[in-house]
């Protein structure tokens, strides 16, 4: 028979969970620390299968005598169990001795769950992600007193133990709450992973004068909507045109071409101002480069607007039919000149003959998908903890710098907050490392990733605005 051991410090709710899983009051529960001194055992059912549940005494690392014996028995029970539920009090902050014991137990038993109890609502659950620093593969939030998350815990246990539920299940009244909770959890996960489809994707077309922006717009639309001329600077006002790509409405803004500062006069100053205002509202920028000519410093400065407005980006290599170099050579120069756009995909096109225009349309949708990507909180925290385990944060003059947990508080672009003990000590190079680590795990091609650091209990201004708080 499979064995499940509940272990943890006194008064974290072990006996209450034992009673909840056993569906009867067997273990005595009390607010007095250390009420449970003997190991309690009870055969229970999980997914229609019998398992042995073991309620250990509360562990105090420094206790001797009676409580030292309790600790010894509890640790032995944990080593012998098939699954260990290490419980902590979610109302308290993570304790170093808990972390040390948890990691020691993990060396003895690979099926070790970290169960954070007393998480009574979603706000407390967000704070509960501080416990991600334990490095647990299975991190579960429950409230035994509110019967919150207990059903999900049972399903995780069944999954690890390979317990298969009977094909026909008749739900009792008690089980209906678990089922409802499970369905709600599925809905919440769906909400985290899938953002509501945008009413329209706003795409700004930017580049120097006469690189073919208006020709590109006409090629995308399939008709001549924007005036095309060999005279540099024909487009003065941004031109808005919309179309549908695979059922998704896309609004294109053909912006005015940008000249070197010394040559900007009168009405073109107005045009530059209008262009920047258009980009403020854009989601994605198509940075158009003329491949029939050498790239210039001005191309780099225009590319800087993408970084300034944190836009999704595609580098469009136009006039590819009359290019003077091969792709590898062009790609090498683009990556060298536009280091801040290393995440941008490159698409070769010819606005004149329609080459790769359909490919560009598909890439616009893909980049927007990445630009609006939301990582489920549990997966995000596991990824951040893996990153910090592989490459620990540098200390700050001998003081430990630690990431407690992470939350993604915004999309378009993805915005992630790292909750830390010393946020001011997060070096830009480590921030870049975290961004690159996320790019290795998830598809963020064409999208910037914004990383912020803050203390516990604080919210940054953009985080407050994203959450709609006062």
UniProtKB/Swiss-Prot annotation:
Q: Does the keyword GTP-binding apply?
A: yes
* Keyword Repeat among UniProt keywords: yes
Report keywords, A-Z: GTP-binding, Nucleotide-binding, Repeat, Ribosome biogenesis
Q: Which domain of life is it from?
A: Bacteria
| Sequence positions that bind GTP 2 | 207-214, 254-258, 318-321
- List GO molecular-function terms, semicolon-separated: GTP binding; ribosome binding
**Domain KH-like: start-end pairs:** 373-457
Annotated residues that bind GTP 1 are located at 8-15, 55-59, 117-120
In terms of PANTHER family, this protein maps to: GTPASE DER
Q: What does this protein do?
A: GTPase that plays an essential role in the late steps of ribosome biogenesis.
The record's comment on protein family reads: Belongs to the TRAFAC class TrmE-Era-EngA-EngB-Septin-like GTPase superfamily. EngA (Der) GTPase family.
Name of the protein in its database record: GTPase Der
Please name the gene that encodes this protein: der
């Amino acid at each position: 028979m499979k064995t499940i051991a509940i272990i943890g410090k006194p008064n974290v709710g072990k006996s209450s969970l034992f009673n909840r899983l056993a569906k009867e009051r067997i273990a005595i529960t009390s607010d007095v620390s250390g009420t449970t001194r003997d190991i309690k055992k009870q055969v229970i059912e999980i997914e229609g299968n019998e398992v042995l549940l073991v309620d250990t005494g509360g562990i105090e690392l420094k206790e001797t005598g009676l409580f030292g014996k309790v600790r010894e028995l509890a640790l032995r029970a944990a080593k012998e169990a098939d699954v260990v539920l290490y419980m902590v009090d979610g109302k308290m902050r993570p304790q170093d001795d808990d972390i040390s014991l948890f990691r020691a137990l993990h060396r003895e038993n690979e099926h070790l769950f970290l169960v954070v109890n007393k998480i009574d609502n979603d706000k407390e659950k967000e704070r509960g992600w501080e416990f991600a620093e334990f490095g647990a593969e299975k991190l579960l939030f429950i409230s035994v007193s509110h019967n919150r998350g207990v059903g999900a815990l049972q399903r995780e246990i069944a999954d690890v133990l390979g317990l298969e539920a009977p094909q026909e299940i008749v739900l009792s009244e008690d089980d209906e709450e678990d089922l409802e909770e499970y369905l709600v959890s599925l809905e919440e996960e769906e909400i985290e992973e899938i953002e509501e489809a945008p009413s329209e994707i706003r795409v700004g077309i930017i580049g120097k004068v006469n690189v073919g922006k208006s020709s590109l717009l006409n090629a995308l639309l399939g008709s001549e909507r924007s005036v095309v001329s060999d005279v540099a600077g024909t487009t003065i006002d941004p031109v808005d045109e919309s179309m549908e790509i695979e059922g998704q409405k896309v609004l294109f803004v053909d912006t005015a071409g940008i000249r070197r500062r010394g040559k900007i006069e009168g009405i073109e100053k107005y045009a530059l101002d209008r262009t920047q205002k258009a980009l403020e509202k854009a989601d994605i920028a198509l940075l158009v480069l003329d491949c029939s000519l050498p790239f210039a410093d001005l191309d780099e400065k225009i590319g800087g607007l993408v970084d300034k407005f944190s836009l999704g980006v595609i580098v469009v290599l136009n006039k590819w039919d009359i290019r003077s170099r091969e792709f590898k050579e062009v790609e090498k120069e683009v990556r060298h000149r536009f280091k801040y756009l290393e995440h941008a995909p490159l698409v070769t096109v010819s606005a004149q003959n329609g080459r790769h225009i359909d490919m560009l349309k598909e890439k616009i949708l893909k980049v927007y998908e990445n630009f609006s990507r939301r990582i489920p909180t549990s997966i995000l925290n596991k990824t951040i903890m893996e990153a910090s385990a592989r490459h620990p944060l540098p200390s700050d003059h001998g003081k430990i710098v630690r990431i407690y947990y992470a939350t993604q508080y915004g999309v378009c672009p993805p915005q992630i907050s790292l909750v830390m003990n010393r946020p001011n000590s997060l070096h830009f190079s480590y921030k870049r490392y975290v961004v690159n680590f996320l790019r290795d795990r998830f598809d963020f091609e064409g999208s910037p990733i914004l990383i912020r650091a803050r203390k516990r209990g604080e919210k940054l201004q953009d985080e407050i605005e994203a959450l709609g708080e006062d």
